[in-house]
């Protein structure tokens, strides 16, 4: 074993003492900094939880604006939401309903998340919301999101719209007394089946389901609506000629067919300003069935429309296929608007007259208007988002 060299006996002790002194001087501040870091991390985590909770409140308010709009404003949630153990209070305000606003409204959402220690974070968000508006669509006699075919000696007294004018196919004897417009002239936002379904479901929720078949002969009084048919529906008349009057919305989830009754059992449908909404196909292919009165016939699928048109030309009827073809060949002059998503085909001898739908009492989404009932939301944009 090596012997200890002269003058080295006290060096180790001195070094140990120096380390202990320096460590004592630096350890306390270092531990203090570590404690401060832990505390700061806890504060940061709490503020982050508050921010997430306040953000969740804004998202919940947006859902309410889109799906369960309040009746009056400003609207304050009756009970705070509990998110991340924070109480979240939410207030929704809206600009006054003004017919000049078009299809948009502005909303303010104030969402405040408060912790147990009284600390809070607030998000102040301003939104612009667009609502379903068929006004531009109803300004035309014929509308298609794809192609239009006009045959024979068809006469159209009104404007025609489709995305590309080159997709308008007409025979040489067709007369169009109006303007042919496409996407370059006017932009039309095509509505979806879901938007229509949401809008008309409000009219019929919890109402009568007539079953898969009705005979007008057995109805007393001869009125229908509001009806909600969970499936398909066939309508016939085996009795004497009669008139069927719509009193409210008819909503059919499946297909709806007005069965050809024969001349001795003919009947008339008075639309009476109401709407027939069909989730599948719609068929009314018999001139033994007459139609009069303003109203709407809207089907998600195909439409076969060949009734006898009666009236004085002052009624406005919307016949619309949302995703399918519209085959149109009625007897008599038609007044209103014909719409098809993939194809609109008018047969020879049809005369279509467009008049203004204003004042006809149509139950269709027309933007915010001056009605308390708002149509489905079609767009939502965040104008500002402030955190405090």
PLM ranges: what are they?
Residues 99-234, 238, 257-263, 281-294, ...:
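Short, ordered "entry" segments at domain starts
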Residues 3, 17, 104, 171, ...:
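Exposed boundary/loop context
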Residues 2-145, 149, 161, 358-363, ...:
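Beta-strand/loop motifs with alternating small/hydrophobic and polar/acidic residues, enriched
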Residues 242-247, 265-271:
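Beta-strand repeat architectures
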Residues 79-82, 243, 289:
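Short, exposed beta-strand/loop patches in secreted or surface proteins that constitute
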